[in-house]
Amino acid sequence: MNPVINYDELLKKIPYKFAIPIAVAKRAENLKEFAHSYVETWDNNYVSIALKELSEGYIRIKNEEILKVLIPNVK
C-alpha cells in the first residue's frame, strides 16, 4: 500500500512552502549517504522517507525564526 503524504497538511505544520522541498532534499541526500532512518516506509525511496520523517516531526527545519519573515501577512 502506498501511503500518501498530503502536502497541504504538511503546510499546516510547517508554513514555509519553499523550505519544505529543500529540507526534504537535504535529508534524502543524508539518507543516501547512509544516515539512519527514523521511520519505516513501504519502499526505500529516500524522498518518501524524508517526507514522512518531516511530517511526523522526526526532523525539522533549522533556523525557522529566519523564515518567519517570508510568511505573507494577508488579510
Curated annotation (Swiss-Prot):
GO terms for cellular component: DNA-directed RNA polymerase complex. The keyword Transcription applies. Keywords: DNA-directed RNA polymerase, Nucleotidyltransferase, Transcription, Transferase. It catalyses: RNA(n) + a ribonucleoside 5'-triphosphate = RNA(n+1) + diphosphate. This is DNA-directed RNA polymerase subunit omega. It is an enzyme of class 2 (transferase). One of its GO terms (molecular function) is DNA-directed RNA polymerase activity. The RNAP catalytic core consists of 2 alpha, 1 beta, 1 beta' and 1 omega subunit. When a sigma factor is associated with the core the holoenzyme is formed, which can initiate transcription. It comes from the Bacteria. InterPro entries: DNA-dir_RNA_pol_omega (IPR003716), Pol_omega/Rpo6/RPB6 (IPR006110), RPB6/omega-like_sf (IPR036161). It comes from Thermosipho melanesiensis (strain DSM 12029 / CIP 104789 / BI429). Promotes RNA polymerase assembly. Latches the N- and C-terminal regions of the beta' subunit thereby facilitating its interaction with the beta and alpha subunits. One of its GO terms (biological process) is DNA-templated transcription. Belongs to the RNA polymerase subunit omega family. Its EC number is 2.7.7.6.
